[in-house]
Structure formats: structure tokens, C-alpha cells
């Protein structure tokens, strides 16, 4: 079968790889000059199935109000002038109940754990290298309230059989030796030894090369204008003056997926803006060895070979990609507070990207009411974590195979009755 994939981020490239491995003739189209040059370019570097959880959670609305008045708050909201933004935020608030949180987290953990298994198999099969580390992730608590609150997360981890370690301040140095110098600032930590880290952009680039070796064609620097419709099906992709035709089409355009298919159906995928800095290591002994998550500022600090990536923040501001100096200041403050002298933040590169977020946190993966149109989008902050599993799942669906995990509640159909501005799909 001929399959066209729109988007060459980590999710699109993973889809291409698994579809090609299943025997399909795959073409990937992207407006950028190469793979992983937008959202996948400089993310926090985590593969964290253990932390797969919705942002929409009980208590978040009150925290959001509090954060509005804090200098280094992890969340910011600025109206973008669209009705869609307001509707999306209302939907997110509706998902902040304990009942919906449990359902949504269950979906996310299921896909994230499956994706981890797919990644491990991929690594065993291909030997792909991406400055990866398997040292787990360590969530740091600065207050007793945060430490006490971890009990709820631990209960969820136990229910999902996810290995964990609850560490005292004195024990943190066993996971991250450099924290010995700042342990007096911390009340403890929650370590998930099964999580991994690495450079997502490097991973995506090398996975694209593996996909090319399987026959996948990548068409970069190509405009993606519209989907051509005929007889209730997709007849092609309009790329400038050319129409690219296939048997099946996959939209993996991240935050841009919503507008691109708006004439067919309305999906609630909104851009959640994040920031990162990447600094050269100047003292390896003072740098992290894996990924550390600062619970107070919701910032991840990840070790690459000779670099430190510091990423976080969530801004609900539409498609604004302005680099704000205050955000860089927060990232530098956090890494220098926990790992002073480890990296040279004065030489750090500063980046921002738009994460495609759904109100319930779960991505949209699978079939649509249009028979030959498939979606693989809305992964939020967990795009790399869920990419391999989403790609394999999508390949199974397109190939007519039964997926290895439950997939019906990951599709767009869960949203077609209550997505902003829509009560039914354009093609039922």
C-alpha cells in the first residue's frame, strides 16, 4: 500500500519506519529542510513512561491561579484572540476531576509502556545510537508538602507495576552524585529506574536514515497546502502545484494538525509552548548523570554526552514562538541551583517549541471517519516517549492487523462529540 505521511518529527518518522518495515511504500513530506526541526528539535530529552500523566489533574486549576503571580511559575496563559483557545481550556478543566484523570492516565501509561518496549526492540534490532542513557529519572522535592504528595503518584506506580525508589536527601547522591552538595535544599526524591534519556533530534535523524534504508522517501522543503477530497475520501495532498497521491494518508503535523484538517473534522490539539537551553558541560563531576525533574519549577535537567539540556514551562499562548528572556532566566536559575558549575549557561543555546496537546493528555492515534485518513498527533510533552508505540500501532491499523494494545480509545472518535466547535465529523 502507498502511504503518505505529513510531518517528519519524531512521531512522523517513527510512523514511516514501522510502516516501511510492514512492507508499505512510504513517502514523508515536510516543509522543513530535514527531520525533527520543529517540536522534536530540542525537547527535554526524556523517555519517561513512568511519568506519563495528564496535565489536566485534580488541583491544577487552583495551582494555575497561584502560578499566575509567581516569577518562575511553570505555567503562563495569554489570550491568543481565538475562540478555540477558550474552548480548549474549558475542555481541559473538565478533565481535572479524579475520575477523568484516572481514565486518561491509564490510556497514557498503556501507550507509553508499550512504546518503551518498542523502542527497546528497535535498539536491539538496529543498534541505533542517540546519546542515550538508561539511568532512570529522578523527581526532586523541595518541600515536605511535595514529598507527602508523592504518595498519590506512588500508588499509581504500584498499580501499574512501575518500579520506583523513594529516596531521602542523603540517598539522592547515590542516583545523582552531584546533588550531594545541595541535598540540604531538598526533602527527597522519587526515582524511576526504568526511564531513559537521550537526544530526540539525533534519534529522529538516525531513525529517518534507517527508514530510508527500508525504502522510505523523504520530501523536504515541500509545502503542504491541503488535502484533496473526492467521494468522501482523501484523493491526494496538494503540495504547491503538485498533487501527491497514495492509498492512505497520515497527518502527523503536531500542533498544526488541527487547522490542517479543520475542513474535515475539528480536533482539540492546541500548541503548548515550551522552552529549553542546551549548555556545554564544563565539569562532569558537577553535572547530572541522567535526568532530574524539579517538582517546584516543573523543569527537566538532562545529561547528554557533553551537554546539559534544561527544558520545561508551559505557555498557553497560541502559535507565538517568541523567545522570552525571563524564561531563559528561570531555566538557568534552576540548573545552576541544583548543579552549580556543571555547565556553562552563558554559552547555552536557547530554543522554544510548540507541543501538540489534547485536553485529556492522551494523543490522537488511529483511524478517522474518513476511511483512508489516519492521525498520529497530540502527544503533548510525551512525543518521544510515545513515538515508537504510536508508530507501531498505526502501522498495525493500516496493515489491517490487530494492535498489541487496546487502541480504540486513542482514536479521534472519543472527541467527535465534544471537540470545540463540532458535534459530528464532516464525513460520518
From Swiss-Prot:
<dbReference type="GO" id="GO:0008718">
    <property type="term" value="F:D-amino-acid dehydrogenase activity"/>
</dbReference>
<comment type="pathway">
    <text>Amino-acid degradation; D-alanine degradation; NH(3) and pyruvate from D-alanine: step 1/1.</text>
</comment>
<dbReference type="GO" id="GO:0055130">
    <property type="term" value="P:D-alanine catabolic process"/>
</dbReference>
<protein>
    <recommendedName>
        <fullName>D-amino acid dehydrogenase</fullName>
        <ecNumber>1.4.99.-</ecNumber>
    </recommendedName>
</protein>
<dbReference type="GO" id="GO:0005886">
    <property type="term" value="C:plasma membrane"/>
</dbReference>
<keyword id="KW-0560">Oxidoreductase</keyword>
<dbReference type="InterPro" id="IPR006076">
    <property type="entry name" value="FAD-dep_OxRdtase"/>
</dbReference>
<keyword id="KW-0274">FAD</keyword>
<comment type="function">
    <text>Oxidative deamination of D-amino acids.</text>
</comment>
<dbReference type="GO" id="GO:0005737">
    <property type="term" value="C:cytoplasm"/>
</dbReference>
<keyword id="KW-0285">Flavoprotein</keyword>
<comment type="similarity">
    <text>Belongs to the DadA oxidoreductase family.</text>
</comment>
<feature type="binding site">
    <location>
        <begin position="3"/>
        <end position="17"/>
    </location>
    <ligand>
        <name>FAD</name>
    </ligand>
</feature>
<dbReference type="InterPro" id="IPR023080">
    <property type="entry name" value="DadA"/>
</dbReference>
<dbReference type="Pfam" id="PF01266">
    <property type="entry name" value="DAO"/>
</dbReference>
<dbReference type="InterPro" id="IPR036188">
    <property type="entry name" value="FAD/NAD-bd_sf"/>
</dbReference>
Amino acid at each position: 500500500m502507498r502511504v503518505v505521511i505529513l510531518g517528519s518529527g519524531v512521531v512522523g518518522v517513527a510512523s514511516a519506519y514501522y510502516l516501511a518495515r510492514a512492507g508499505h511504500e512510504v513517502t514523508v513530506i515536510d516543509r522543513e529542510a530535514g527531520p525533527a526541526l520543529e517540536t522534536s528539535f530540542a525537547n527535554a530529552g526524556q523517555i519517561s513512561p513512568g511519568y506519563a500523566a495528564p496535565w489536566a489533574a485534580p488541583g491544577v486549576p487552583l495551582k494555575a491561579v497561584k502560578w499566575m503571580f509567581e516569577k518562575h511559575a511553570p505555567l503562563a496563559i495569554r489570550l491568543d484572540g481565538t475562540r478555540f483557545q477558550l474552548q480548549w481550556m474549558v475542555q481541559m478543566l473538565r478533565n481535572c476531576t479524579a475520575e477523568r484523570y484516572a481514565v486518561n492516565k491509564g490510556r497514557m501509561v498503556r501507550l507509553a509502556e508499550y512504546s518503551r518496549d518498542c523502542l527497546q526492540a528497535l535498539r536491539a534490532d538496529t543498534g541505533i545510537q542517540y546519546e542515550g542513557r538508561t539511568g532512570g529519572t529522578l523527581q526532586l522535592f523541595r518541600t515536605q508538602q511535595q514529598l507527602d504528595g508523592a504518595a498519590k503518584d506512588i500508588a499509581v506506580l504500584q498499580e501499574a507495576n512501575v518500579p520506583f525508589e523513594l529516596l531521602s536527601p542523603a540517598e539522592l547522591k547515590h542516583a545523582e552524585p552531584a546533588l550531594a552538595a545541595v541535598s540540604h535544599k531538598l526533602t527527597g526524591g522519587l526515582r524511576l529506574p526504568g526511564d531513559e534519556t537521550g537526544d530526540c533530534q539525533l534519534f529522529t535523524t538516525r531513525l529517518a536514515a534507517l527508514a530510508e534504508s527500508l525504502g522510505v522517501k523523504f520530501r523536504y522543503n515541500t509545502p503542504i497546502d491541503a488535502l484533496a477530497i473526492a467521494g468522501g475520501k482523501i484523493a491526494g495532498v496538494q503540495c504547491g502545484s503538485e498533487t501527491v497521491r497514495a492509498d492512505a494518508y497520515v497527518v502527523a503535523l503536531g500542533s498544526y494538525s488541527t487547522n490542517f484538517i479543520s475542513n474535515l473534522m475539528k480536533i482539540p490539539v492546541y500548541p503548548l509552548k515550551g522552552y529549553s537551553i542546551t549548555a556545554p558541560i564544563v565539569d562532569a563531576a558537577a553535572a547530572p548523570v541522567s535526568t532530574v525533574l524539579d517538582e517546584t519549577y516543573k523543569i527537566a535537567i538532562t545529561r547528554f554526552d557533553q551537554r546539559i539540556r534544561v527544558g520545561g514551562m508551559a505557555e498557553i499562548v497560541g502559535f507565538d514562538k517568541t523567545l522570552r528572556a525571563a524564561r531563559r532566566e528561570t531555566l538557568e536559575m534552576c540548573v545552576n541551583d541544583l548543579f552549580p558549575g556543571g555547565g556553562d549557561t552563558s554559552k547555552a543555546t536557547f530554543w522554544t517549541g510548540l507541543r501538540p496537546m489534547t485536553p485529556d493528555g492522551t494523543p490522537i492515534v488511529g483511524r478517522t471517519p474518513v476511511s483512508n485518513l489516519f492521525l498520529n498527533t497530540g502527544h503533548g510533552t510525551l512525543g518521544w516517549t510515545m513515538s515508537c508505540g504510536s508508530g507501531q500501532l498505526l502501522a498495525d491499523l493500516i496493515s489491517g492487523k490487530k494492535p498489541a494494545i487496546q487502541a480504540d480509545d486513542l482514536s479521534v472518535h472519543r472527541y467527535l462529540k465534544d471537540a470545540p466547535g463540532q458535534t459530528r465529523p464532516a464525513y460520518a
